[in-house]
Design a protein with these regions (language model features):
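Conserved, well-structured core segments that form or line functional sites
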Residues: 1-183
Length: 183
């Protein structure tokens, strides 16, 4: 497998979102390498996207979204679950891709269908907010044998507050994959 480098992330968010499907999320934890194949993502296109955390401008919570591409934006939801996003596009754009589900590949003992569950299984928490994904402990890699995938597009989950943006088909997943959180 080959680690994804900064130019991969410094592209249009929709392109990055679709290209992440089938790649490996890798986290080295206490001498153990956890690997999951990304099977579901959601694109958040920037400050004009009403469902995006960046839609109301830069805050202490979402500042990482406005930073350079290729960093992890990790935040807490419901006071108990972490979610991991991949920052995309140019600095100050405020765009990211939420990793929603993984298919376990190595050393993942828990369920990974849903952003909170996958963060728990991969031991990703807020301490990794801002982590450079081109580093050595938490990164995304292209598998040597990545097969072509059929991509399905649906509306994002849990963004009913976002008006017309709630219905845009910005959730992408590998069609017929059993580890997708919701069809």
């Amino acid at each position: 497998m080959q680690k994804l480098l900064r130019p991969f992330y410094d592209r249009a968010t929709l392109t990055v979102a679709k290209d992440l499907l089938g790649t490996y999320l890798v986290h080295d934890v206490a001498g153990e390498r956890r690997i999951g194949r990304i099977v579901e993502v959601e694109a958040y296109l920037g400050s004009h996207d009403r469902a995006s955390h960046s839609s109301k401008g830069r805050t202490a919570r979402n500042a990482v979204m406005f930073g350079p591409p290729g960093h992890a934006y990790v935040y807490l939801i419901y006071g108990m679950y972490c979610c991991m996003n991949v920052v995309t596009e140019a600095q100050d754009h405020g765009a990211a891709v939420l990793v929603r589900a993984l298919a376990p590949v190595a050393n993942i003992p828990l369920r990974t269908q849903g952003p909170g569950l996958l963060c728990k299984a991969m031991q990703i928490d807020r301490r990794l907010n801002g982590h450079d994904l081109t580093g050595d402990t938490l990164f995304i890699a292209m598998p040597a044998d990545r097969p072509a995938v059929r991509i399905a597009a649906r509306p994002r989950i849990g963004v009913a507050y976002a008006g017309e943006w709630a219905e845009k088909p910005l959730r992408f997943y590998i069609q017929d994959d059993p580890f997708v959180s919701r069809k």
